[in-house]
Swiss-Prot record:
Annotated function: Catalyzes the complicated ring closure reaction between the two acyclic compounds 1-deoxy-D-xylulose-5-phosphate (DXP) and 3-amino-2-oxopropyl phosphate (1-amino-acetone-3-phosphate or AAP) to form pyridoxine 5'-phosphate (PNP) and inorganic phosphate.
Database matches in NCBIfam families: pdxJ, PRK05265.1-3, PRK05265.1-5
Similarity annotation: Belongs to the PNP synthase family.
Name of the protein: Pyridoxine 5'-phosphate synthase
Record-level GO cellular component terms: cytosol
PANTHER family recorded: PYRIDOXINE 5'-PHOSPHATE SYNTHASE
Compartments, record wording: Cytoplasm
Organism name: Oleidesulfovibrio alaskensis (strain ATCC BAA-1058 / DSM 17464 / G20)
Keywords: Cytoplasm, Pyridoxine biosynthesis, Transferase
SUPFAM superfamilies: Pyridoxine 5'-phosphate synthase (SSF63892)
Single GO biological process annotation from the record: pyridoxine biosynthetic process
Residue runs in coiled coils: none
Listed EC numbers: 2.6.99.2
Active site, UniProt feature: 43 (proton acceptor), 70 (proton acceptor), 191 (proton donor)
Length: 241
């Protein structure tokens, strides 16, 4: 059965608006765990716009489930990953001017570079994932890098303006899941998924994890973190394996 991993970046976004001490993303991570999240995601961006180094360190030290560290493929971030020892490192592209991650990592043509970058991480026993588009060339390239997981970008599906466009994007993702599984990769989905559109994947098999943050944090503002996480976890519990 697929599981829910919760991204707490936007708890930190709210805190950083006032450069204060609350809301505390570490507390949010613990509440998400108590409510049924099977893992916590933090994206430590190079510009530190939301999650800070102390957040990563404290969550890594106190979490009872798994911590996923999203990061750009830079020497600094690799050094942090090797110090923190998260369960999984997920490489994502970054642009300074973007509000959020806008697309998948380009892997095709960079297999040797990315494999070399990840080698010390793998040697430490840390698993890796690549955040990519549901594109056959990128999925095949990801296998050659040696990552155990891919996370397929669902943002274009979530942002679709029409039902036809949404259906096309969904079908592309489903084909991507099937190809990745055929190649021996574990598959996660993430970006823009919410309490409504996630049902489009209810009967899709082969998905290991759903990575969800913004919609859960948005609901948590109104209902509380535990209730928001529990509601999403209950939805995913009905999905195909």
């Amino acid at each position: 059965m697929p599981v829910l991993v919760v991204n707490v970046d936007h708890v930190a976004t709210l805190r950083q608006q006032r450069m204060g001490k609350e809301p505390e993303p570490v507390t949010a991570a613990h509440l998400a765990e108590l409510a049924g999240a099977r893992g916590i995601i933090v994206h430590l961006r190079e510009d530190r716009r939301h999650i800070q180094d102390r957040d990563v360190e404290m969550i890594a030290a106190t979490l009872n489930t798994r911590m996923h560290l999203e990061m750009a493929g830079t020497p600094e971030m690799r050094e942090i990953a090797l110090r923190i020892n998260p369960h999984i490192v997920c490489l994502v592209p970054e642009k300074r001017e973007e509000l959020t991650t806008e697309g998948g990592l380009v892997v095709a043509g960079r297999e040797k570079e990315l494999a070399a970058y990840l080698a010390p991480i793998h040697a430490r026993g840390i698993r890796s994932s690549l955040f990519i588009e549901a594109d056959p060339a990128q999925i095949r390239a990801a296998r050659n890098v040696g990552s155990e997981y891919v996370e397929l970008h669902t943002g274009h599906f979530a942002d679709a303006a029409t039902q036809d466009e949404m259906r096309r994007e969904r079908d592309k993702i489903v084909r991507g899941v099937e190809l990745a599984r055929t190649l021996g990769l574990k598959v996660n989905l993430g970006h823009g998924l919410n309490y409504t559109n996630i049902y489009e994947f209810k009967n899709v098999s082969g998905i290991s994890e759903y990575s969800i943050g913004h919609s859960i944090v948005s609901r948590a503002v109104l209902t509380g973190m535990e209730k928001a996480v529990a509601q999403m976890a209950a939805i995913i519990a009905t999905f195909s394996e």
